[in-house]
């Protein structure tokens, strides 16, 4: 699917359809560039959909003295909430104090800094709590008493990527998924890029290129014959999803005796998301999965805190992603910096190649703005500065505290939808839900129901407006309905896709 007309040469080719690549493509298009976005798989099919689903400052990074990164991340937290209040929500996190681990003075100091260095405005401040009286204490073992409650944000990470791509396409970006870059080389003052897709091999040309391929950044540089002294550290983060362990909206920040931390987060109404691990990854990137050891580790960690025990057999879904971190020589993978580096190759008549090293979801927008600023001397059509801080993503054009009102409006206008379906739709599409719900006055107007309120109208929207091509794209990235649909329902969806595509 392409939303831009063909021409002989693009101003900018962005290689990589994760959050950084889509963010850069959107920003550059909004400043006047003609952009091509190339992704070898589905949007967000790599690291960007395998996060802990948080928009956060990174409380644990204070321990590693990454004050600048935490400050930047905290500042971005409320900016992102404001431009995408349907897929980003404030969340309160409960941090129990655990005897023998980090002392209370250290936790208080860290939380004080967390509250004050990032320009917090709308989110509530940290509070000291007594877990013997606090609602979040009910699910925990009785030995936990003192604790703290602080603010951060939750995000639907894959939809964040898709919405950046959608907005980019609306601004003229040519988005091509399932398109592999097999060769790229400088030729006649521009980049000559050879791609392979179901359409066969094609050659495109661009005045500048961005390498936003995440864990494959060094591989692409090698193919472009542009060596770098930069070293990457690939760190695997694994997560598990289990049936709901608690009946409230708080999340948990837990410490472990090995010094690591992990989260337990309310997830998709009926589940709890637990993660993450930090393990150096030396395998391939095509099929990254949580190991049995990591799954057991997360279960054991949860069992140190929750009154109800879980085992690997309770895990209904697990996933893992490889984080492409800048190798700063840290002894332990969890201590490696989550900051990013932008490396520009080009000048003196040579077309620019900008490579992205590292980064985290929370800083993607700021990274994109900085990347486009670096490209301005090479692309004179780029006009203006950072514009994305106040430009809503598709569906996010409503007040940042207005999700409940938006949901109520959908429930009123589409009374035939189940309340759980209305809630899911509001949190996925925001104001854009009405684009595909349209004037429907009954369920049959939305076509087939594949299960749990997932209708033909919604599936068609994913295909025509969100680049979905497979059931996995729909059920595990555009939504998380894969947690609910059974095999027969998935088969029915796949038959529908075969007929349509």
Predicted regions and their residues:
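Helical element adjacent to the flavin cofactor pocket in flavoenzyme catalytic cores
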Residues: 148-203, 207
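Dinucleotide-binding Rossmann-like beta1-alpha1 core, especially the glycine-rich loop
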Residues: 53-136
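Short hydrophobic core segments
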Residues: 13-15, 204-214
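A short, basic/flexible loop-to-alpha-helix module at the beginning of a structural domain
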Residues: 1-9, 200
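Beta1/beta-strand and adjacent pyrophosphate-binding region of the FAD-binding site
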Residues: 6-20
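C-terminal catalytic lobe of FAD-dependent flavoproteins
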Residues: 151, 157-159, 167, 227-238, ...
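Flavin (primarily FAD) binding-site architecture
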Residues: 211-226
């Amino acid at each position: 699917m392409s939303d831009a007309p063909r021409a002989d040469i693009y101003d900018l080719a962005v290689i990589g359809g994760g959050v950084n690549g889509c963010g850069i493509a959107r920003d550059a298009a909004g400043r006047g560039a003609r952009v091509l976005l190339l992704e070898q798989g589905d949007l967000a099919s790599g690291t960007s959909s395998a996060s802990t689903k948080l928009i956060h400052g990174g409380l644990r990074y204070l321990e590693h003295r990454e004050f600048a990164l935490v400050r930047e991340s905290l500042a971005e937290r409320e900016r992102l909430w404001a431009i995408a209040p349907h897929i980003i929500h404030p969340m309160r996190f409960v941090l129990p104090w655990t005897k023998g681990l980090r002392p209370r003075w250290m936790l208080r100091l860290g939380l004080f800094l967390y509250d004050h260095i990032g320009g917090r405005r709308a989110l509530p401040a940290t509070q000291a709590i007594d877990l013997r009286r606090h609602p979040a204490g009910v699910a925990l073992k009785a030995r936990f008493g003192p604790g703290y409650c602080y603010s951060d944000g939750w995000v639907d990470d894959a939809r964040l990527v898709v919405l950046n791509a959608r907005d980019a396409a609306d601004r003229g970006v040519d988005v091509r998924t399932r398109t592999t870059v097999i060769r790229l080389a400088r030729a006649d003052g521009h980049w000559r890029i050879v791609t392979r897709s179901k359409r066969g091999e094609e050659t495109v040309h661009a005045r500048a290129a961005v390498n936003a391929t995440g864990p494959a950044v060094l591989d692409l540089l090698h193919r472009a014959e542009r060596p770098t002294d930069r070293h990457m550290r690939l760190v695997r983060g694994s997560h598990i999803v289990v049936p709901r362990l608690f009946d409230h909206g708080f999340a948990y920040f837990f410490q472990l005796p090995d010094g690591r931390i992990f989260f337990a987060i309310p997830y998709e109404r009926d589940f709890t998301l637990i993660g993450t691990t930090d393990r150096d990854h030396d395998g391939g990137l095509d099929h990254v999965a949580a190991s049995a050891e990591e799954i057991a580790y997360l279960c054991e960690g949860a069992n140190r805190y929750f009154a109800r025990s879980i085992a690997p057999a309770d895990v209904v879904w697990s996933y893992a992603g490889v984080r492409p971190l800048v190798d700063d020589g840290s002894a332990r993978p969890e201590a490696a910096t989550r900051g990013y580096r932008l490396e520009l190759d080009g000048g003196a008549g040579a077309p620019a190649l900008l490579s992205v090293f590292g980064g985290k979801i929370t800083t993607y927008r700021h990274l994109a703005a900085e990347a486009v600023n670096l490209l301005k001397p090479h692309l004179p059509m780029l006009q203006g500065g950072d514009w994305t801080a106040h430009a809503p993503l598709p569906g996010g054009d409503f007040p940042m505290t207005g999700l409940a009102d938006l949901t109520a409006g959908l429930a009123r206008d589409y009374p035939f939808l189940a309340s759980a379906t209305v809630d899911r739709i509001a949190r996925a599409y925001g104001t854009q839900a009405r684009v595909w719900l349209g004037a429907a006055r009954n369920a049959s107007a939305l076509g087939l129901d594949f299960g749990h309120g997932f209708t033909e109208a919604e599936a068609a929207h994913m295909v025509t407006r969100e680049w979905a091509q497979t059931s996995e794209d729909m059920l595990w990235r555009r939504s998380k309905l894969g947690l609910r649909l059974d095999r027969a329902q998935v088969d029915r969806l796949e038959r529908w896709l075969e007929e349509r595509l």
